């Protein structure tokens, strides 16, 4: 046994008289470093925080079930804090570039996560890109504009209104405005908040969408696209709107097929990963 070992044994023995565990206390510098390492380990990246919050908010996962107001505000607060870099997107990426092809600009879909209770994704639109008017049956949807300027037009159905045909219904305009990031997260509900909406990119835009529950044909949550016509386009008995209010209403007619001017490509999400 060497001298260093003997001395070390004596030091430990002496310290054990005052330290019941017989352990040599760590110096403060090492303790601080360990605390700092622990703090770093507990930091949760924004997209992971979003995922964890969605699991709580959409725990029910049933069609038409609107989360409590407390849960809605909790998820809204998380989304309001998310920045483009938190999900790995920026305006310089190739799918935000303008192209001259004579066709509608390509919309890029980035899949982050999906289950039967909720989905998280990003829509990337170059300038003039359009997501045509469509619905969200029995869903609650949170949309966060990450960057850019976008025009949003949305409608809600007018309940119990006579219809000119089985595929055409009267709707009231909910939103018809430009939005520029940073701005508040928008929320639509199964029967309110602008359940049918259309996005038109004024500049390159990225929209982070959280949908609960997501589209599902077997569950009856099918995505339907619409044409919108001015109120004066149809004359229906029993439907009367004051002249000055007519611009606030429109007739929405179901489109039989997916819009020809909508081209969406799905690409791999390359931002921070989620741990389930």
From Swiss-Prot:
This is Plant cysteine oxidase 2. InterPro entries: PCO/ADO, RmlC-like_jellyroll, RmlC_Cupin_sf. CDD domains: cupin_ADO. It holds the Pfam family PCO_ADO. Its EC number is 1.13.11.20. Optimum pH is 8.5 with CGGAIISDFIPPPR peptide as substrate. It catalyses: L-cysteine + O2 = 3-sulfino-L-alanine + H(+). The lineage of its organism: Eukaryota, Viridiplantae, Streptophyta, Embryophyta, Tracheophyta. It comes from Arabidopsis thaliana (Mouse-ear cress).
